[in-house]
Amino acid sequence: MQKPQSQILEKDSLRVLRIALDKLESGFDTLPPLTSASKDGAGLESVLLQVADRLRDNYPYFHPLYAGQMLKPPHPVARLAYALAMWINPNNHALDGGRASSQMEKEAVAEIARMVGWNEHLGHLCGGGTMANLEALWVAGQVHPGLTIVASEQAHYTHKRISAALGLQFESLACDKKGRLDVDVLKRRLDQRGIGTVVATVGTTAIGSVDPVPKILELRKQYGFRLHIDAAYGGYFGLIDNLAAEARGSYDRLSEADSIVIDPHKHGLQPYGCGCVLFRDPAVGRFYKH
């Protein structure tokens, strides 16, 4: 009996991609015809086969049954749509770089914003969590110039590096026994003044801990700091219904943050690289004018 093969991309999916490519091409059929840049089909095949052979030297993170890596494979539809878009290679830096894809980006970002309870927001997609956090902390520095940013010792290491790159003071604070930001330590530091932004991590990459957002929000009422939530890894876990009560309590309060980072290329099942930065107050767009 022949052993069934494990397929990365089903042949039927490739057939659908071919149909979609034909439809895409028909939208530009008024352009002058061009001959192929390379008529050497054998040469092209040789190069692609070499690439395919070298790509086999990877762990099978892409397989849906692989449980030894924190990231999940892209959804088949996302993978095909990504390939389809690469044929026109849009650039959403401005409408002239990608008119249709910019509109689709706005729709996707709005869906992510609604996931955390925001109907009104400002945000966009970017290359990943590092760039998204950089932008959020840059805005935080504009809102509270000269004030310090704090995060837990379990927060992603890039917060410290980002703060240094932006010329902002940064401090790491101790965690409790569950790896969460210790709110008693945070309160003592707030009493010393000079804190402009608190970074709460909802799903640390090392141990999956969730900072106590409700307790941090109570401190915000007293001290008036800006709350940025790094949910690059953990953001999509808010959709599941079997979270522990403490974790659910934090997810249910995400909408009260000033800014949030979520990575669709993690548990949003999108291809690399796809991060998302969101701001609750669209007025921070004033910092983008140039």
Model-derived segments and spans:
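PLP-dependent aminotransferase-like
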Residues: 144-193
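Conserved beta-loop-alpha segment that forms the PLP phosphate-binding cup at the N-terminus of a helix
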Residues: 104-110, 121-145, 158, 162
